[in-house]
Amino acid sequence: MSQSGPQTSALAESEARSRDYAVLCLLTVINVMNFVDRQLLASFANFIVPDLGLSNTQFGLLTGFAFIVFYSVMGLFMGTLADRLHRPRLLAFGLALWSGLTAASGAAKGFVTMLIPRMLVGVGESVATPTAMSMLADRFPSRQLGFAAGFYYMGVPIGVAASLPVSYTHLTLPTKVTVYV
């Protein structure tokens, strides 16, 4: 005998809630990765600065100003796009952009060749939070949105803390290539 009526409706609602929480967990993992990535350049400063012949000012620009300006300004633009475009595709674009340019920064030979990818990494990472917040608002009722946002933002301290063992693991590997962020 098949289920019908209230039982079927309750099962469908339960499955939908499970998907909502799975999306929340995935978005939180993306946020963790966002903050791990953001911290790694500073973690490798003792290797990158001499390797690229950077001054302290140049390195400060790479880890601060160049990234933050693009991240902050583009965050406003990406928030607008998140309200208008297909959010999962926009998030995938941001992830691909920041991941690809993080990898490309490993080929940097000096300040300018590291500066350009860092600016664009800021653009890619700026997609994550406004898009995630819009996706969460679509999936969670207003009475649960505070919990969902709090869970998502838990990724910030976890990502910062996780960057330390990640950088240590890379530093203990036998090849110089692993140092590139």
Residue ranges with predicted function:
Residues 39, 68-76, 160-161:
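Residue-level signature of mid-helix packing/kink "hotspots" within the transmembrane helices
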Residues 44-72:
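Extracellular/periplasmic helix-loop-helix junction of adjacent transmembrane segments
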Residues 53, 86, 107-112, 141:
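Helix-breaking motifs and short loop linkers at transmembrane-helix boundaries and internal kinks
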Residues 74-108:
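Conserved MFS/SLC helix-loop-helix module at the cytosolic interface between two early adjacent transmembrane helices
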Residues 101, 112-120:
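Paired small-residue
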Residues 117-154:
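Cytoplasmic helix-loop-helix junction between adjacent transmembrane helices
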Residues 150-164:
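Glycine-rich segments within core transmembrane alpha-helices of 12-TM secondary carriers
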Residues 169-175:
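Conserved small/polar residues in nucleotide/adenosyl-binding loops
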